[in-house]
A protein has these predicted regions:
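Core alpha/beta structural scaffold of self-assembling particle/tube/pore-forming proteins
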Residues: 1-212
Length: 212
């Protein structure tokens, strides 16, 4: 399957495909090889039942804090954000340091804060990025974040393990490799690493939030 064009909401394929609702699309050969993300780490058994070799069915305390609405989207509210914030700190004994959501939810949360803007200024992070200020913690937007989700994260419980840093494959003596049957060359950039979490219960995933 080859993608020939992409817009903000539509991907055009070279040939027609039959997909069903809730099907997933992956970059070729990447499924199962990507770094574990927060959707799998801050989970119970919906997406990842065994994390870092630990079964969450056997050890439920290795699951994240989940606030959902049984699959029915509801509006994001400041009270709901506060509920998730406190649940992570009370039930998981975490120290929340960061909120993450989609751009649509980030915009909606900003609008909810607008009446109190002079009391809740935005925050400027390293690199010049701007974040919303909630309980003196930054909320940032992630362009790759799954829709209808918000995360409160205890960053101190996350770590990244690296086997090899970013590098080009040159095992045959060359970085560029001829593409069979085409007047083209390609290169392979690799990075062997994994995201890990020592205590997923310190973070919370608020699910089923309306993006519209």
């Amino acid at each position: 399957m080859k993608v020939t064009a992409v817009s903000g909401t539509t991907a055009t394929l070279q040939t027609a495909q039959t997909w069903a609702n809730n099907d997933w699309v992956f970059r070729e050969d990447s499924r199962g090889n990507e770094i574990m993300g927060v959707q799998g780490i801050v989970d119970v058994t919906t997406f990842v039942t065994t994390l870092h070799g630990i079964s969450r069915s056997t050890y439920p305390e290795f699951g994240g804090q989940i606030l959902d609405n049984s699959g029915t989207n509801r509006p994001v509210t400041l009270d709901l954000l506060q509920q998730g914030f406190l649940q992570a700190e009370q039930n998981g004994e975490g120290e929340i340091s960061l909120g993450v959501c989609t751009y649509n939810l980030w915009r909606k949360i900003g609008n909810l804060m607008a009446p109190d803007r002079r009391y809740t200024p935005s925050m400027t992070l390293a690199g010049g990025f701007t974040a919303l200020d909630f309980n003196s913690k930054p909320i940032v937007a992630d362009r790759d974040g799954p829709a209808n989700n918000f995360w409160w994260l205890d960053e101190s419980s996350f770590t990244r393990y690296e086997l090899a840093d970013w590098d080009f494959d040159d095992t045959d003596g060359s970085v560029l490799h001829k593409v069979s049957g085409e007047a083209a060359y390609e290169a392979l950039l690799y990075y062997y690493a994994e995201m890990a979490c020592t205590d997923p219960a310190n973070s919370v995933n608020i699910r089923d939030l309306s993006e519209t």
